[in-house]
């Protein structure tokens, strides 16, 4: 059971925080007031970065953050990916930390089954869900899992996101520290020695 908060609608303070990412925050807020059910594309890199994960794996990461860690900032789902809002600079630092952890790897790698994480930072933009949660979110549509509710939300940095990703991967995929067995090796039964 997850202790993730069930906040599906952004508060006015959260909307102001999201709008502060753009060049014209007042225009963004006015647009949202006119169309509260419309998603919007916002730039990353100044106020927040976004780490995108496949939705099931992302949910495991989110559960780790809330059950065993410090919690999370805003989190959204868009087109089968979970968008974890992170501290600015995370998109630049996290890929090197994942490489250090031997994340993903090639087809024969021991971590090949671990899903890729996409990092959106300076120069990137993401589609954020509508401010209102809506009564029934469409499957595959965008919605908030944890909507922004304050003008200055806490955002996890790259080390916290790495911590959650590694723990979620360990729970989801058995990663052995031993190399795969050689199928051509000759094995002798020594239990029946005389």
Regions found by a protein language model. Name each.
Residues 1-79, 88-93, 145-194:
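Signature for HUH/AEP ssDNA processing cores
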Residues 65-149, 161:
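Metal-dependent DNA replication initiation modules
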